[in-house]
Structures are given as C-alpha cells and as structure tokens.
Design a protein with these regions (language model features):
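Metal-coordinating catalytic core of metallo-dependent amide/deamination hydrolases
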Residues: 102-234
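N-terminal metal-binding scaffold of metallo-dependent hydrolase/deaminase domains
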Residues: 1-38
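Divalent metal-coordination and catalytic microenvironments
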Residues: 9, 27, 47, 58, ...
Length: 245
C-alpha cells in the first residue's frame, strides 16, 4: 500500500476552500481533514492551493506536437510525451486529445491515417510513462470526402469517447468573413492567391455533396455507440438549434 499525506494546503472543495490535509492511499483520496498533520513524512504545501485535476475536453496540443510546422512530422512517441508533460504541468489529469479526420483540400496531417497514435498511447501508458489519462476526441470535417475512411481506424478503440462535427467551408461559421479565411490560408497554409480563389470556388460544391451525408453518418454512429457528440464553431442561434436537434 502506497500512502502520501499533503498538509497545510488550501484545499478546494465543491463549495468551499479549507486549510487542511489530504491523505492519498494507492492513488486515491482516502480522507480530507481540517488542520495540519504532524505525521512524519507529510508534505507541507505551505498554504498553496490544492485542486482536483482538470479535465480538458478539446485541445489541439497533441496535433501541434505531431506536426509542429506545415509538412513537418515529429515522431509520435516523442510528440506524445512532450504533450503529456505540458498537459500535466497545467494541472490537467484527464485529457481528450483532439485529432482531426478529413481534409477537404487533401493536405496536412488530417488528410492522413493518424491512428498509429493509439498504439503509442497504449504503449506509453502500459510502461507507466504518461502522467495524465488520455482519451481521444475525434474532430470530423464534414465536407471532406475522406472523413469516414480516416475515422474508421479509431471507431472501436476504447480511448474514443467524444466526436465533434466541424465544417470549415469558407463563408460560414468560423470563416463567415472570407478575408479572415484568406489571411489564414495564404499565411499559415502558404497558399497562393490563385489556389485560395480556386478552393473558394470548389468549397460550396464539396460541402453540398459531402457535409449532410457525413453529418447523418457520424451522428448515427455516435448514438449507436454511446459516444458524446459536440458541434464546432456554432455562431448563430440557428446553429445552436441545429445542434440540439
């Protein structure tokens, strides 16, 4: 049995903050008591705040480590360990790592099979290397013709807990202002003006062909498998009403 005692802490409870002591036994909270502990070996937190671990539902931080620059791919094990260290340092003990599937423009990591990260998560967790608990949040790009295909390797893995539905078609939601989309794609993505205008012309047709069929498929899948479902970049009351429906 492993036991730790944290004392002289400002312990954040559900309805108050108390100066007290927390006893941990085999990785679980055994007791929370007011006052200081005189037990030898108790760790004095000197009045620091002691909070429950945070739960992060949506972070792109893992993707950032896997591809720190456009078209630059980092080894998955090193990327996950760096990401995990940052997450733990921020007080996050449970993280839903967001991984995008599907790219209407067929470029970047989201246009590729990224499911190898699942095996890396399992490997590092089994080795006791990871500090935080990692689940997977799959972000489904609805206008992408390859969204379902790239989702398939994740579909039945026990780490999959959350799906969110995205549509980054220029002219609506996040890209309601076309000029903002232009700055992003020509700046961060390195597109030429000609490529941006070309993709802008194709986007409505791609959306009309794939977005609704993919939406229905992913919603049905989430409901059938008991997965949490979220929407993305809702910017109007109509978007919220659509999400609730």
């Amino acid at each position: 049995m492993t036991e730790h005692i944290l004392t002289n802490a400002r312990v954040v409870l559900c309805d108050e903050v108390v100066r007290g002591t927390v006893q941990l036994r085999d990785g679980c909270i055994a007791s929370v008591d007011p006052g200081r502990s005189s037990v030898p070996g108790a760790l004095d937190l000197e009045g620091d705040l002691l909070l429950p671990g945070l739960v992060e539902l949506h972070t792109d931080n893992l993707e950032r480590h896997l591809m720190p620059r456009p078209r630059v791919f980092f080894p998955a094990q090193s990327a996950l360990q760096s990401h995990d260290a940052e997450i733990a340092a921020a007080g996050i003990t449970t993280v839903f790592d967001a991984i995008g599937v599907g790219d209407p423009y067929d470029e970047g990591a989201r246009a590729q099979d990224q499911s190898a990260i699942l095996q890396v998560m399992d490997l590092l967790e089994d080795a006791g290397v990871l500090r935080s608990r990692h689940y997977v949040h799959i972000r489904c790009e609805l206008p992408a013709p390859n969204a379902r295909e790239l989702f398939e390797p994740f579909a039945h893995h026990p780490r999959l807990k959350l799906l969110s539905l995205m549509d980054h078609t220029p002219g609506q939601r996040q890209w309601s202002d076309i000029e903002h989309a232009r700055v992003y794609y020509t700046g961060k993505k390195g597109w030429s003006e000609q490529k941006f205008e070309h993709e802008l012309r194709l986007a409505p047709q791609r959306q009309a062909e794939h977005a609704q069929p993919n939406l229905r498929w992913f919603v049905d899948f989430a409901r059938a498998h008991g997965l949490a479902l979220a929407t993305h970049d809702d910017t109007t009351v109509a978007h919220v009403d659509e999400a609730q429906a």
